[in-house]
């Protein structure tokens, strides 16, 4: 990409990082803490990690996936931390940019709806080299896959070959969230590690060169 395009993305990302929509003009209840948008867009990366929203550790660090979920995701991708955080290789743009808070049971709330509505389409337009989108969880799958998303996350991920073979650009691979909460899901669905992960790793390595 040209320096002009890089500057345009940098300027737009700076606007996102200064966003306060969920406090000043929220949909429903306002964000219960000070916003701290976390994203790593890229004008040169070919791979987009479309995740859900930061958790508590990421809210503190200001870097995506600096937690156990990140360790598991990097293992799924078979990449090092240096590769993962290299913005010439990966763009990381969650559906919600700020930690949304927790529910009464201690689980993270869904991504804030304001983020995608305000920012996602123009961000995608500024990342034209993306040719593989890893949709992590239902919210990313709904936005990036539309009608191609199946009724449940399990059905969507299970049907990854059909989704991959569809004539769409960029290519999409649906994934569950790498949270420890999904360890049981992984045990109940051994095909994920046996079939999908080897294919995913080969596509990642192909794009990283």
Which functions belong to the PLM regions below?
Residues 2-208:
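A polyanion-binding, active-site-adjacent surface
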């Amino acid at each position: 990409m040209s320096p002009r395009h890089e500057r345009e993305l940098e300027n737009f990302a700076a606007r996102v990082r200064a966003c306060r929509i969920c406090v000043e003009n929220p949909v429903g209840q306002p964000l219960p803490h000070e916003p701290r948008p976390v994203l790593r867009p890229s004008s040169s990366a070919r791979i987009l990690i479309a995740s859900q929203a930061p958790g508590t550790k990421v809210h503190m660090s200001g870097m995506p996936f600096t937690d156990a979920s990140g360790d598991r995701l990097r293992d799924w991708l078979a990449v090092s931390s240096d590769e993962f955080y290299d913005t010439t290789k990966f763009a990381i743009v969650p559906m919600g940019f700020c930690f949304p808070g927790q529910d009464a049971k201690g689980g993270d709330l869904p991504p804030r709806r304001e983020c995608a509505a305000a920012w996602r389409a123009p961000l995608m337009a500024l990342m034209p080299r993306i040719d593989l989108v890893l949709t992590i969880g239902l919210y990313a799958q709904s936005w990036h896959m539309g009608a191609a998303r199946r009724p449940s996350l399990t059905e969507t991920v299970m049907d990854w070959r059909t989704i991959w073979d569809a004539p769409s650009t960029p290519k999409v691979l649906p994934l569950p969230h790498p949270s420890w909460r999904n360890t049981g899901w992984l045990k109940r669905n051994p095909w994920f590690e046996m079939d999908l992960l080897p294919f995913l790793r080969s596509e990642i390595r192909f794009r990283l060169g």
